[in-house]
Design a protein with these regions (language model features):
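Short beta-strand element of the alpha/beta-hydrolase
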Residues: 71-81
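Mobile cap/lid helix-loop segments that gate and shape the active-site cleft of serine hydrolases
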Residues: 43, 176, 192-226, 232
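Primarily recognizes the serine-hydrolase "nucleophile elbow" in alpha/beta-hydrolase
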Residues: 128-202, 218-219
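N-terminal cap/lid segment of alpha/beta-hydrolase-fold proteins
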Residues: 34-70, 202
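C-terminal catalytic histidine-bearing segment of alpha/beta-hydrolase fold enzymes
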Residues: 51, 63, 123, 237, ...
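Short beta-strand/loop motif that positions the catalytic acidic residue
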Residues: 235-238, 242
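Active-site glycine-rich loops that stabilize anionic/oxyanionic intermediates
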Residues: 79-84, 240
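Catalytic nucleophile-loop/oxyanion-hole region of alpha/beta-hydrolase
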Residues: 87-88, 93-94, 108-144, 280-288
Length: 305
């Protein structure tokens, strides 16, 4: 709350344009209890940036759930789109659906291969988003030990990359966000691309790695190869006859989790349309696909509900 004696003109006068934009967005968001979009990095600090256009500025859009007296879980959401676009129904719709269950949603606009970016730019954006939510947990009513990552299709590949390539943060950084761990506390992988090998999605691989990636890069970003005992618990689902992203991707990640004793659930459903999302639209979300009920049951087991 701003004290009644504060002179806003003086406050604004000592702010940089970037600080004013972020501060105004935060204040308006808190007053409206609505979504706001914030840059993930301060102006000029995006690693590997190719410019200052909208496509060069990764952002986080907040979808706060109704607040309670206790800190609540949060889901960082990575929409799919083959690393060439971002599917709104796999971002905002997921966040609004989870809001009804008391889970805060944070949707990431990450950099894309269609705009000239390649790995590791996308991973940097996803990791920064988890760090940002953890660093700002108290301000948003988030439990810093219940921050998940959720992704669909190529967004699922990015989520699985963070699940297997996270770090503990840089304790020496002057940026408090960078001091935070990027490890999610759990993951949700929806018809996810997992492998960069034979059963990968060709467009996602090309947009992420370019035309002629090295064998080492293909191995490293085939995330079934990178599961360890430190990989967080994960909920995995696919449609049996998905023609774009074969179920072998989900099965490979589940098999790796089993081998390394990582808690997981794997659900394979009848059907074939790729990219179905919830199978229902806001605001009512009538008759969603059964995977949503299975996810909510699993989240309850994880003590997220």
């Amino acid at each position: 709350m701003i004290p009644s004696q504060t002179n806003l003109g003086n406050v604004i006068g000592i702010m940089s344009p970037f600080q004013f934009l972020v501060g105004a967005s935060l204040i308006l968001g808190l007053l409206r209890a609505d979504s706001v979009t914030l840059p993930l990095w301060p102006a000029g600090a995006v690693p590997g940036s190719r410019g200052t256009n909208d496509a060069d500025i990764p952002t986080l859009t907040t979808y706060p759930a109704a607040r309670t007296s206790q800190a609540q879980p949060a889901m960082v959401i990575l929409p799919g789109g083959g690393y060439g676009g971002l599917a709104g129904h796999e971002g905002r719709d997921y966040a609004l659906f989870l809001n009804r269950e008391g889970v805060h949603g944070f949707v990431v606009k990450y950099r894309l291969g269609s705009q000239g970016y390649r790995h590791p730019s996308m991973l940097q954006d996803a990791a920064r988003a988890v760090r940002w939510v953890r660093a700002h947990a108290a301000e948003w009513g988030v439990d810093p030990d219940r921050i998940g990552i959720m992704g669909s299709s190529a967004g699922g590949h990015l989520a699985s990359t963070l699940l297997t390539h996270h770090d503990g943060g840089d304790a020496q950084s002057s940026d408090r966000v960078e001091r935070m761990s990027s490890r999610p506390n759990l993951g949700v992988l929806c018809y996810a691309v997992i492998s960069m090998g034979p059963f990968s999605h060709a467009g996602s691989r090309r947009n992420l790695l370019g035309e002629n990636p090295s064998a080492e890069l293909i191995e490293d970003l085939s995330n079934e190869n990178r599961v360890t005992t430190t990989t967080p618990p994960v909920f995995i689902w696919s449609l049996r006859d998905d023609g774009a992203v074969p179920i072998e991707n989900s099965m490979a990640f589940a098999t790796a989790c089993r081998q390394h004793k990582v808690p997981f659930e794997l659900h394979l459903y009848d059907g074939k349309p790729h990219g179905i999302g919830l199978g229902a639209k806001p605001p009512t979300f009538e008759n969603p696909h059964v995977w949503t009920a299975d996810l909510l049951a699993w989240l309850k087991i994880q003590r997220w509900r």
